Amino acid sequence: MALDDPDAAIALLERMLAACPIEATCLPGFLSMLRAQAAFATAGPRCVVSKVNYMGDGGGIVCRLDFGLGEGKPAPVVSITHLLFDGDHPLSDDIAAYQKHRITRLREQSA
């Protein structure tokens, strides 16, 4: 069973690339894991998605994050499913629909 509709995922990816940078909030589980790394110990939940890529059906849409911690810090890359996007962003409904669909498919696949 495919997790994504590749055409829909790539269409969303292209719209997100055109809209970058996009403000987002890290979900608590991801933020805790990130803060366990010394380079991100002071990272707040708010970040900026500076770039997006599609990693195929297995990886989905991934986002490169900027926490504004200064030059020389690594830029973490995370699945879009670990982020929340502001509801007033023009792509928020499309992003939320993609996230919901992907999470549902991942749960079905692991059941």
Where on the chain are the PLM-derived regions?
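Basic/aromatic-rich interaction segments and small domains that mediate binding to polyanionic partners
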Residues: M1-E14, A18-P21, P28-S110
